[in-house]
From Swiss-Prot:
This is NADH-quinone oxidoreductase subunit D. Keywords: Cell inner membrane, Cell membrane, Membrane, NAD, Quinone, Translocase, Transport, Ubiquinone. GO terms for molecular function: NAD binding; NADH:ubiquinone reductase (non-electrogenic) activity; quinone binding. Its main location: membrane. The keyword Transport applies. It comes from Pelobacter propionicus (strain DSM 2379 / NBRC 103807 / OttBd1). NDH-1 shuttles electrons from NADH, via FMN and iron-sulfur (Fe-S) centers, to quinones in the respiratory chain. The immediate electron acceptor for the enzyme in this species is believed to be ubiquinone. Couples the redox reaction to proton translocation (for every two electrons transferred, four hydrogen ions are translocated across the cytoplasmic membrane), and thus conserves the redox energy in a proton gradient. It is found in: Cell inner membrane. It is an enzyme of class 7 (translocase). Its EC number is 7.1.1.-. The keyword Ribosomal protein does not apply.
Amino acid sequence: MEYKSPVRSNLEQTADPNHVLVNMGPSHPATHGTIQIIAALDGERVAKADIHCGYLHRGFEKESEHHTYHKIIPFTDRLNYCSALNNNFAYVEGVEKLLGIELTPRCIYLRTLLAEYNRVADHVTCVAATVMEMGAMTAFLYLMTIRDYIFEHLNQLTGARLTYSFARVGGLKNDLPDGWLERLEEILQFTEKYCGRIHGLLDRNRIFIDRTRDVGAMSPEHALNWGYTGPILRSTGAKIDIRKDNPYLAYADLDFEVPVGIKGDNYDRYYVRMREIDESISMVRQCMKKLPDGPVNIDDRRIMYPTKDKVYTKIEYLISHFKLVIDGIQVPAGEIYVSHEAPNGELGFYLISDGSGRPYKLHVRSPSFAHMGGMHTLLEGYQVADVIATFGSMNMIGGECDR
């Protein structure tokens, strides 16, 4: 018996017999991860599309049930690995709320600063990949230079370029090193300068406008019906942002605008992300000015790991460290949902504790998964060449989508 892929045969049953079925992915240089797009083509036009994800599923949620709360932090890095700090902070806030602990003022502002700084890196990566696939190599190199500077700078703070594992339940891994804020201001100025060049290269570029304006367009109602959030939803004109609507960390104390688009097309998604870079830079500077003195971690040996000098010299701290590593934090029984405005949209963690040192259940509301659910509607009716540009503007991250 001839084997037929159930994925492909499903579309074959509903597609016009005169259409040509084309596979894009799951191994394709433009898919930014393992995702499969099956397109039924009528000439150069996409008549029907079917999106299939799950090829990068690693069992994040099930694995979390067998690890202590601190040991899950590195797993969250591997969701959206372009902005791992945002994943870290959303997850640990859920644990902190179940514990009922209050962060130090310095920790709150540092988390806000780092979340926005990482947002800049995520947005420049998305725009760079999208414009590169449309042939704008100069803009791509400018944006990747910004990204590299940010990642090297975060490496000085965290010890890693991408997967930081920097958050801790009750604080952060460490405070800022000497000279880090001074270098931060230099990179912000460099980013503003090079983003200005990007606007000059692309905003009124005839080729770029033809490839993006009125391509992959949607209404606010359509976006909300499919569960879109973040820059993709705001590109339609919907002014919805968790940082404004339900402030967390220090966002209630910051002055910032929520950029929105008009048509919800590829151009508006580019525009919203570029404007959000400006707003994030402004918020980082506000956090730098308002950054209070004091400790970054709470003083509670039941939650925080003791410093190494204490572990190696005092038996009570060694015992405390041992208990946290083996048994984990004893989180009171309960359940909570925490959502943050991640670079891709609403990143939520639904956490259930049974009172032990390991979560009973941890579910992730990943924005990329919701976005892929309705992406076929943005591809159908457009050209084959538009598939790559539209897919790039959605910024699907495989680790976040498939978990």
